[in-house]
Amino acid sequence: MTQEITVIGGGLAGCEAAWQAAKRGVKVRLFEMKPNCYSEAHHLPGLSELVCSNSLRGDSLENAVGLLKEELRRLQSLFMEGAEATKVPAGGALAVDRDLFSQYITSRIESHPLIEVVREEVTRIPEEGIVVLASGPLTSGLLAEEIGRLAGSYLYFYDAIAPIVAADSIDYDKAFRASRYGKGDGDDYLNCPMDEEQYQAFVREIVAAEKVEPKSFEKVVHFEGCMPIEEMASRGPETLRFGPMKPVGLVDPRVGVEPHAVIQLRQENREATMYNLVGFQTKLTWPEQKRIFRMIPGLENAQFLRLGSMHRNTFINAPELLMATCQLKSDQRIFFAGQITGVEGYVESASSGFVAGVNAARLAQGEGLVVPPAETAIGALARHITNTEAGHFQPMNVNYGLFPSLPGRVKKKEKRGLLAQRGLETLEKWLPELS
């Protein structure tokens, strides 16, 4: 008799895990604490809420995340189905309307006959049965304590949320439309240019601004991919200009040259009524954010629909605790999925949920478990999370540095394309194993 699977957490990983298990004929109970209880960063009542940004990053196979998305498309991922159905213009990236995305995933999950959505907080891990723990980086207190006892120890760090401004409060005489190097439709981003004097004054204010301080018992460890702007600014006056404010590839059509620095605004929803400040995650106090970000040309009268904030991310030491199948080494009926495993990013979380969901279903049906090939993006990420050195483990985005080397000498400009080609060819050969 096939066992029922319990999935804890209705985020990207949990929904993907539940969907993949149900697709394979296994009954799933998916627990989600919203709307009865919200974390400090969540606001929508639906499943698969996107918190940090509405961007799913680059779509080109030149980027490993682009390959990961293509693999998930071919694997019939619910995450990618929802993303394609709710996407908004974003140059060479894939971005979604976060409200529509959550609504889409919620509808698909709730309408599946083998998935029961239970709206209540889980405070104890079931002692029997197959469990997928996908409680996310903002795991609630009692469940976090449970995981701590189960795992022996857990790590934590902060990442940050970027502000959103109302489109009708932007001064379009000062901002110009362009995508870096003309990618996408060429005008998917709004760009607020700064000259050298404006940039230097802006950086000085950020460095001197009042910040939200962490509690005394919390050690701050920032993930490089979601670094607060004030942390970057403190590293040197030019750091922001080589980070989120880099002007390279953005020519102001009014003067015909690249500005000294640029703040990019990305469309947040389909109606184009909201724009987020790209890469401007921050832990500045809210009054300081309003004051300093209104120094940006074009945002002098900005209406902030959401201000930046900080939240804690909880993740386990996956190389120490997990098998490549996403199973807990010490109790193999328990699977972990999503950011709590140390993958970083929306697409990566869904990828982790895919592997956990497939394997949980196979375990429930008495079949052998699978490990995606290391030559694929989904496999390279899974291998890194479970095989890297445990003593120096940190959250990781998918990138081509995680992939096995290509044989022989390969020209640098050809390497990424060949890695992507090999990855997709390997995936196609692996698909029959999932049947």
UniProtKB/Swiss-Prot annotation:
UniProt entry tagged with the keyword Nucleotidyltransferase: no
Gene it is expressed from: trmFO
- A single Pfam family it belongs to is GIDA
- Catalytic reactions on record: uridine(54) in tRNA + (6R)-5,10-methylene-5,6,7,8-tetrahydrofolate + NADH + H(+) = 5-methyluridine(54) in tRNA + (6S)-5,6,7,8-tetrahydrofolate + NAD(+); uridine(54) in tRNA + (6R)-5,10-methylene-5,6,7,8-tetrahydrofolate + NADPH + H(+) = 5-methyluridine(54) in tRNA + (6S)-5,6,7,8-tetrahydrofolate + NADP(+)
What name is this protein filed under? Methylenetetrahydrofolate--tRNA-(uracil-5-)-methyltransferase TrmFO
Q: Which NCBIfam families match?
A: gid_trmFO (TIGR00137), PRK05335.1 (NF003739)
Give the residues the record marks as binding FAD. G9, G10, G11, L12, A13, G14
Q: State the UniProt keywords alphabetically.
A: Cytoplasm, FAD, Flavoprotein, Methyltransferase, NAD, NADP, Transferase, tRNA processing
Stated family: Belongs to the MnmG family. TrmFO subfamily.
Q: Where in the cell is it found?
A: Cytoplasm
EC number(s) per UniProt?
A: 2.1.1.74
As for what it does, the entry says: Catalyzes the folate-dependent formation of 5-methyl-uridine at position 54 (M-5-U54) in all tRNAs.
